[in-house]
């Protein structure tokens, strides 16, 4: 792959992958041919920063988890929020404990959402490479058959 396409891939992956993932991805791209660029741009990478913003503004309702694609965990956030609100009407001490636990999970989830989106993006990239290698093998086998 030529250096212009590698630079373009590097720009696309800039904030989408961790540093180690980006280095590994660029090393793997060096062996590919330039014809994959149109299909590479079709990969729907999610932004970890957008996930953090969703979590910051709608995190109490599972916004960051829904953005990441963890629907069940987003639903659990909604259920937990409702339970914390119900605890508020019964007992103040129970509410304080439930709210403290909810805030701790909410805070830890900032890190987990950010790293999880980067990991999901890397997995999408690996699946893309696997598909590209498979389709190249199929083409070469079809060419050999003729």
Outline where the language-model segments fall.
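Transmembrane helix recognition focused on a "late"/terminal membrane span
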Residues: 1-55, 77-146
